[in-house]
């Protein structure tokens, strides 16, 4: 059995989120929380919330044991990009892309 949690439209670049997701993919849930706690990146805090939600979904909706869970899938997708313009010299404008991410975590119980 598996449980899933999704965070949509997180105001963070998918590239930066993906680096942190690579650290926890395949790990035990307790080990993943420990890794995220000491990872000095902003994405770690958001991913920790999503992981906590996935564990809660597993316990409450599927009645799985939290101590036997591991991160089966962890991936990030591109959300909509907010486009902003920065004024430059000589009347030019420079486009700034503020990227968003859709984070998906799936936890399963070890056999």
Curated annotation (Swiss-Prot):
Superkingdom of source: Bacteria
One cellular-component annotation, GO: cytosolic large ribosomal subunit
Database matches in Gene3D superfamilies: Ribosomal protein L22/L17
InterPro entries, per the entry: Ribosomal_uL22, Ribosomal_uL22_bac/chlpt-type, Ribosomal_uL22_bac/org-type, Ribosomal_uL22_sf
UniProt keyword terms in alphabetical order: Ribonucleoprotein, Ribosomal protein, RNA-binding, rRNA-binding
Coiled coil regions, renumbered to chain: none
Role noted for this protein: This protein binds specifically to 23S rRNA; its binding is stimulated by other ribosomal proteins, e.g. L4, L17, and L20. It is important during the early stages of 50S assembly. It makes multiple contacts with different domains of the 23S rRNA in the assembled 50S subunit and ribosome.
Assembly information from the UniProt record: Part of the 50S ribosomal subunit.
Protein name per Swiss-Prot or TrEMBL: Large ribosomal subunit protein uL22
Species per Swiss-Prot/TrEMBL record: Clostridium perfringens (strain 13 / Type A)
Gene name for this UniProt entry: rplV
């Amino acid at each position: 059995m598996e449980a899933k949690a999704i965070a949509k439209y997180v105001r963070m670049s998918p590239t930066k989120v993906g680096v942190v997701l690579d650290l926890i993919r395949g790990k035990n849930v307790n080990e993943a929380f420990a890794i995220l706690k000491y990872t000095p990146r902003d994405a770690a805090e958001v991913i920790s919330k999503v992981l906590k939600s996935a564990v809660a979904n597993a316990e409450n909706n599927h009645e799985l044991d939290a101590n036997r869970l591991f991160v089966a899938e962890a991936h990030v997708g591109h959300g909509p990009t907010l486009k902003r313009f920065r004024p430059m010299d000589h009347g030019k404008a420079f486009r700034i892309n503020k990227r968003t991410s859709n984070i998906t975590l799936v936890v399963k119980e070890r056999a």
